Amino acid sequence: MTQSPFILRTDYEPRGDQPEAIGQIVSNIEAGVTDQVLLGVTGSGKTFTMAQVIARCGRPALVLAPNKTLAAQLYNEFRQLFPENAVEYFVSYYDYYQPEAYVPSSDTYIEKDSSINDNIDKLRHAATHALLTRRDVVIVASVSCIYGLGSPEYYAKLVIPVETGQRLSMDALITRLVEVQYERNDYDFHRGTFRVRGDVLEIIPAYHHERALRIEFFGDDIDAISEIDPLTGQVLASVGKTVIYPASHYVSDRDNLVRAISDIRDELGERLRELKGGNRLVEAQRLEQRTMLDLEMMEEMGYCNGVENYSRHLDGRKAGDPPSCLLDYFPDDFLLFVDESHITVSQVGAMYKGDRSRKSTLVDYGFRLPSALDNRPLEFHEFLARLNQAIYVSATPGKWELDRSQGIVAEQIIRPTGLVDPITEVRPTKGQVDDLLGECRLRAARDERVLVTTLTKRMAEDLTEYFNEMGVAARYLHSDIDTMERMAIIQALRRKEFDVLVGINLLREGLDIPEVSLVSILDADKEGFLRSAGSLIQTFGRAARNVEGRVLMYADVVTRSMQAAMDETARRRERQTGYNEAHHIVPATIRKAVETPFDAIYAEAAEAKGRKGKGRKGAAQAAETFAPWSSDPHELAKQIQQLERDMREAAKELEFERAAELRDRIRLLREHLLGAGGAG
């Protein structure tokens, strides 16, 4: 095996089942095994095992997560494990997204409406930039990575190399920058823009916030290249040569654009004849007006709103061909880790059908050309065709993963902490609420927390209200609560602002809370998705990070799913306790800071600034400067927007020190939001 470019930084050695699992997975990869499963119980260190495998194999890796929040958590963990390598984050960059749609029954057209998170867009560009420039790359992504992205061939083809002494006029460079969708803005200098001052051109690349490039010209030659602070103009480093990557993934050179526009006109003519032949004159007029407006903008600007709907023509694909996506940016030998595979695999399979249904209506009624159907996520078989070697990671792998891997399973049942699976108990449903209330009071008195899962939203609300009336502080989670607020509620539970969290689906992200010593499942004998054997095992795992962990199921009969879940938990528990006895291990509850992984950055920034101040007073002022104003993620987002306005105003007034302070604060607040799972 060649030397790995990854440097794993950790104070821990693999323990429990980790050494055997790591060795087995690495051996299988080296032997060419294409699919295998890592079955790891909650708290067994699956992320650490993945990192060890990546470091030993030395290949670029994609870690696929079922949602943005879990992706953010994994991103933070991998950044800490690989601080010297490229760990990047690739999720949907929309803070808000209302897709274009048409409802024929009410003749209602819903225009696309969205809000793009600039920080996430930067991270997406950083991800593709890393993949095209180095091999020591780990990309943590949500399933949005299977959606269409610009062709990597065109993206790489349109990079702009610059170096000192190069014969290149400023006008020629400006023309090329505009072609790859950079905008000139001499007043509001931000990511994806450039400005000109005399013989100096400055640009902030699409994959940077904090650094800009300064290119100085002497006549038609490049005289010097520097990296600078975009706010203060301070030179950070001299650069002999560099490469500027496009500001958009949907870029095309002029020749290709001319060909694409011609192809779009041909398709439009063909579709109009078809619609008029069917006497659908309204649809024909609508389609012609909308498409001609887009073509006019593409001819003038090189792009248009919704340009992704023409991606088939821009990429030169045939009808029905799959789009390029993030997977196409990886080299052929990459590794894929599908985290929480029992959820993620089915998500990948479902993406195409939902997208197709919505767009078919738009095409049928003249809002889009048929080629818009090819701006889509990958179909499941297309996704599989792009894989090289995959590891499916879950505490409860599904039948598909087990069949796909032909029984090649590495088990992590033993936790490095010595913690064992919780004891499970079944009690009758009669009087279940008051019985549970008593259990909650016991846990609250011991400074422990409780998770309760119900069948309906109404029951969750009623139970929460009743517990609060009876003096037990409780809150509930439901589908109306967005990701950021959800993380805030979970942090509040850990801080003991309340003791009982009630919800319908406690299988979602962010609920591995070491303070939880009791998980209660009401109406456990009502069969369904959330009461299947796999779901029950996942729910049991929420109590597996506390040495006092218990599971209470309220049911009048023991269903097949309940029995299977209890049997599997008993099997794991027996093996875990046996290992502990043999190795003289005494389990202890995990101690974990309540703060997000980014909170240490606040402390470091405050301390550094405090050293420049006057003793304790300087440190106190620094802490006030760098601490977030609010723990509410919505408020944090508003604060960031206000601070960005203040920063630009300060820079305009030449108050560079003030602007730099605001810049640092914005960066920390953005990372705080990302650590809380709210980054887009």
Swiss-Prot record:
Where in the numbering of this chain does the Helicase C-terminal domain appear?
A: 432-594
Per the similarity annotation, which family is this?
Belongs to the UvrB family.
Q: What does this protein do?
A: The UvrABC repair system catalyzes the recognition and processing of DNA lesions. A damage recognition complex composed of 2 UvrA and 2 UvrB subunits scans DNA for abnormalities. Upon binding of the UvrA(2)B(2) complex to a putative damaged site, the DNA wraps around one UvrB monomer. DNA wrap is dependent on ATP binding by UvrB and probably causes local melting of the DNA helix, facilitating insertion of UvrB beta-hairpin between the DNA strands. Then UvrB probes one DNA strand for the presence of a lesion.
Residue span, Helicase ATP-binding domain: 27-192
User: What's the protein called, per UniProt?
Assistant: UvrABC system protein B
Concerning SMART domains, the annotation shows:
DEXDc, HELICc
Q: Where is this motif: Beta-hairpin?
A: 93-116
Spell out the GO cellular component terms annotated for this protein, sorted alphabetically and separated by semicolons: cytoplasm; excinuclease repair complex
HAMAP family registered for this protein in UniProt = UvrB (MF_00204)
